[in-house]
Amino acid sequence: VGGGHSPVFAHASVRIQLEAAGELVQHLRREIGARGDGEYKSPEILRPRRRPIVLWLLGPSSPIHGNAHVHLTDTRFFVLARLLDVLLSGHAVRGIACPGRNPHTRPMALALYQSAEQSYGTARWQEFLTLSANLFRTNNRWLPKTPVQMFYAAVEAMAQTSAAADVQQVISLLRSTRPIAEATRSSHLQNPKLTPLMEPLLPALNRTVHYWGEYTQTLSVVHDEQSALTPERIADMATAIAASHSGRQLSEVRLVDSRREPRVQLADFVAGIARRLA
């Protein structure tokens, strides 16, 4: 996120019975011409010659038609919106919440997203995005040792550079937020079980659960294994969902090996297609 390879994070889900999912995966493997028993990922189905397979999978005769959902995250906007929510919203921010929904900070994030690169140049702006993403990361030993110092040094330098008025206003506001950044980072260092602020998976899963919650009050999720999905974070999400929607319940998030779970493989296909289209 931020300095990553893909500007879009896609999180897909399908609502389908296990047996039907297995049959569909086997059908797709036959159409692809898969050999052996290895798992086939979305790049295999995205090759140009397999376009008819993709069109069928997304079409009205497919078993997942009307039973698939994709949550797309623009990773650059995610970083900017989360950064400003934490530093300028005036209240505590939970890692499971989708950034960019705060009416106070959203216009600021949009201003940076739309105009800052033109003001500061691509290389400098990419560096700022990377520093922003690293500001609240605490679980990667390859990160710089002084992320707060490096971020605010960049902010100070940008404050001395001419930029669009709305961009300059946001950068000016950031100059006084260092105590908030230090306190937030310290809190996450002291409690590694807190949901990471710059991890898009948790908000995407949260929104996925809310989407399917419109169809059923009690949800059970089967998800591929991810280190970010700890029992504590899943419990935090379940509590938040129950509090925000009376009667709605996230009963289970079961982590599985995607090689042995056709429903997860189908979701991977759908996510890959959506990411390519985005």
Task: Name every feature range the model reports, one short phrase each.
Residues 2-278:
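Phosphate-ester processing/binding pockets and catalytic centers
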